[in-house]
């Protein structure tokens, strides 16, 4: 696996990274679950998953993809494909995060509690799955992202914590 191939994998996943990080800045407002409870008596997702965070995160991730297209059009082939891929990566990332929150509520982890693995990789796996029909990575690139993403996630969260955007560093 060449360094170039690994860098392209990182370039590919940037919309998902930005989408996953954005809700802490643009979120708030009405919770996606509308305050509803699941059969187990716990919130479906909790107050931390909002429509503004979801829509804003997808919009920011998609905008990152558009910017990427103008920097490296050969990577995508067309603006339409770039926007579609960025949208799928962004929505997939936030869908994976939402699924993670659902499972965290089921095991009674409160909002903001860390779930090692789920927090760092759930968004990535979901983003890759959503984007699969449009553009895929090879197995080496996927393994690279599975290894590097937890460190990117932890670093981004620590940065957001130090900036005062998050109340916890995870």
UniProtKB/Swiss-Prot annotation:
Domain of life: Archaea
GO cellular component terms, A-Z: plasma membrane
Pathway involvement of the protein, from the record: Membrane lipid metabolism; glycerophospholipid metabolism
InterPro entries in the record: CarS, CarS_archaea
Transmembrane annotation, as ranges: 6-26, 53-73, 83-103, 114-134, 140-160
Chief location: membrane
Catalytic activities: 2,3-bis-O-(geranylgeranyl)-sn-glycerol 1-phosphate + CTP + H(+) = CDP-2,3-bis-O-(geranylgeranyl)-sn-glycerol + diphosphate
Membrane topology: Multi-pass membrane protein
Documented EC number(s): 2.7.7.67
Location within or outside the cell: Cell membrane
Cofactor requirements of the protein: Mg(2+)
GO BP, sorted A to Z: glycerophospholipid biosynthetic process
Alphabetical UniProt keywords: Cell membrane, Lipid biosynthesis, Lipid metabolism, Magnesium, Membrane, Phospholipid biosynthesis, Phospholipid metabolism, Transferase, Transmembrane, Transmembrane helix
Gene Ontology molecular function terms on file: CDP-2,3-bis-(O-geranylgeranyl)-sn-glycerol synthase activity
Family stated for the protein in its record: Belongs to the CDP-archaeol synthase family.
PANTHER family reported in the protein's UniProt record: CDP-ARCHAEOL SYNTHASE
Protein purpose: Catalyzes the formation of CDP-2,3-bis-(O-geranylgeranyl)-sn-glycerol (CDP-archaeol) from 2,3-bis-(O-geranylgeranyl)-sn-glycerol 1-phosphate (DGGGP) and CTP. This reaction is the third ether-bond-formation step in the biosynthesis of archaeal membrane lipids.
Name of this protein: CDP-archaeol synthase
Underlying gene: carS
